[in-house]
Amino acid sequence: MFQIPEFEPSEQEDSSSAERGLGPSPAGDGPSGSGKHHRQAPGLLWDASHQQEQPTSSSHHGGAGAVEIRSRHSSYPAGTEDDEGMGEEPSPFRGRSRSAPPNLWAAQRYGRELRRMSDEFVDSFKKGLPRPKSAGTATQMRQSSSWTRVFQSWWDRNLGRGSSAPSQ
């Protein structure tokens, strides 16, 4: 669950330029508050004065207009950053919006799963397991069809010799 921390006005003014990605605050390094390394969701263009006017926007709108605070480098769905215990260092790059289409999140999960399975497959050969012979099997199947043709042509020739009617 994300909560909106309450800031003191001086802390909020110091961190407003850092939240927008404009570099370090002009006042220098003050006490490390939770607002120094967090920012609003990138899709919401609210400034600090708007937050002061409506500090409890989630209770007025039933949660629909709630401001979500997350770290700058986070591009994962809710809960992954806190669970993994990642550092709270700000990144120079802006994180992906949480309003990205669900297909994107599904594609990323699918891609990670495929990558994991591929890595397991490659690692299995390092453990001494034999390589699969799927390419050889495909070659044998093609050869068996050509052997069938050879056998049929031989059969046709032999039947043609034994019978009075010429073959072909």
Curated annotation (Swiss-Prot):
Pfam family, one: Bcl-2_BAD
Biased composition (Polar residues): 49-60, 136-145
UniProt-listed GO biological process terms: ADP metabolic process; apoptotic process; ATP metabolic process; cellular response to hypoxia; cellular response to lipid; cellular response to mechanical stimulus; cellular response to nicotine; cytokine-mediated signaling pathway
A GO cellular component entry from the record: BAD-BCL-2 complex
Tissue expression profile of the protein: Expressed in a wide variety of tissues.
Summary of the function given for this chain in its UniProt record: Promotes cell death. Successfully competes for the binding to Bcl-X(L), Bcl-2 and Bcl-W, thereby affecting the level of heterodimerization of these proteins with BAX. Can reverse the death repressor activity of Bcl-X(L), but not that of Bcl-2. Appears to act as a link between growth factor receptor signaling and the apoptotic pathways.
Protein name: Bcl2-associated agonist of cell death
Organism field: Homo sapiens (Human)
Higher taxonomy: Eukaryota, Metazoa, Chordata, Craniata, Vertebrata
Gene transcribed to yield this protein: BAD
